[in-house]
Amino acid sequence: MTSASDDLVDLPIPAAELTVELDSGSHWYGGAHLLRQLWPLERANWEVGPLYPFDHGPNGLGSVVGTHWVNSRGLLVAVDPETPMLHAGLNAPLEQRSTFTPRYFGVGVQHKKSVSGMGYYDICVLRVAVSAHSDVRTATLAALSPLQSPHQMPPAVFFQRSIWTTWATSHADITQSDTVALAEAVIQNGFQPGVLEIDDRWQSRYGDLKFDSLKFPHPKQMIEQLHELGFLVTLWVMPFLQESSSACSEAKRLGYLVDGGKPPSILRWWGTQPVRAIDLTNDEAVEWFVRRLQKLQLEIGVDGFKFDAGEPCFLPKGALTRRQLRYPGEYTQLWVHKVASCFPLSEVRSSMWTSGYGGLVRMGDRDTVWGVENGLQSLIPALLTSAVLGYPFTLPDMVGGNAYWGQFPDTELMIRWAQASVLMPVVQWSIPPWKVSIEAKEACFAAQRIREKVLLPRIEKLAASAATSLLPICRPIWWLDPLDPETFCIDDQFAIGVDVVVAPVVQQGARERRVYLPRGQWLEWRDIAGIDHCQPHTGPCWIVVEAPLQKLPIFVLVHSDN
């Protein structure tokens, strides 16, 4: 679809709009991470709005965004991600449909030549591909096939050990003594060292990449001490420079910053300090920033980085860059491919057509609550959405959530969160289980042991396949039998490869749950005895299993007729 005008003028109306009617007999998957993550997708009300990564977007959009959708009947709808000012919505109130449109208005990034902030194109093209396939799995594979693969796995330590981050317990008040105390407590409480992530506010001024000398008087010695304890160490960074920093002064002098806004320095973000964004369209600016990160590694021995932000929603309206952004999501792509990809031990939170990145793609911050509204029940739907979008190396948010607003998990929530997380590709801790209760500590330790016995023997093969083909490590249950309609709405189970079904308990107070097993012979896996050969289950079938607080229901396929 195209729309043309005789002259380059601001257009107050959409150039083109495509609507796909959603029939009641099919279920939809893909699109994006949402603040209220529902599976299947037609359960959600996704207001029409800009389609690019957001930090709590106005239409509920999150930081991981794709441009394809598949349904349970094998239909694939894919939109060109390079469409300027692409908007999308699905099943908005009173409208049972999916809508795609390039619009000449929105929020965040706007066309730089437009005084009004609206779009400025003589011709705008909306490219949409619709194809029919035999089933939803085949449609998903068709959607993944044109995407770039990383061709290398993230470092093995991510899978074999855990990430421990300072965020949920210290937030911005982190200090050197707090960091070392966390590392020592991990070992003292029987957990293995892994990757220790020093989160926000280790710097005195954002962008200078220098430890706050009051909070971290001896950073190099600290990192050496953490290494001796068996940890690799990563630092939190973002593409923003604090205006009072020497880095910002240097970048401003060199022309490495995004301009625009009134005044030019205005940049809305979650912090209170005035900041400027690095111009990632400027190769010299990117090289300057990457060199500074590499210099920091050499000077103090840090092993990698947690790359936060990168969403174009933070850029000022009328953003002026060295090279005009072709579409807003390009800023995210530059952050991931040009910066984060330079560091093997790394993770990002924002993604849009960045499946070629070889690090971890994490879920957004979760609240310390049970529900699907950004709590425990949103983890599996987000994991499965990542699988459909081509991000197999998913990092779930920290066990127990972020402990914002005075929240803190009780024993039950902490245990169930750990059980839901430990068989995902990577597990991340921040709230120490031993600070919740002795029971929580013991159950979380047991969950880690389950990971070692169930996932680790399989992870190398699955991760190698994911690196070359984007085949998900953790898969929707319909992946095992894509023609079985019973699998289409299961939002609280997932498969590991083709032979394990994981069914965490995510309902508060539940001590049993229904589990669906696809075709084949299934045996329950038990922590102490291993596979229970006494009670085989022949699928497809629903069963009810006991799930006391210490138990994570797991089933292993021993024979398949598929």
What kind of region is each of these model predictions?
Residues S24, L35-L38, G190-Q448, L480-P482:
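Aromatic- and carboxylate-enriched substrate-binding clefts and catalytic-loop regions
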Residues A340, P344-S346, W353-G364, V388-P396, ...:
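Catalytic core of carbohydrate-active enzymes
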Residues P154-T169, P264-A277:
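N-terminal small/glycine-rich loop or linker at the start of catalytic domains
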Residues L8, S63-T67, S72-G74, R161, ...:
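Extracellular structured ligand-interaction cores
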Residues M1-A156, S177-Q188, L480, E546-S560:
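Catalytic and substrate-binding clefts that recognize carbohydrates or anionic sugar/phosphate headgroups
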Residues V70-G74, P81, D259-K262, P518-R519, ...:
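Short acidic-glycine loop/turn motifs at beta-strand connectors
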Residues D55-G57, V64-G66, P150-M153, E184-V186, ...:
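Generic recognition of flexible, low-complexity loop/linker segments
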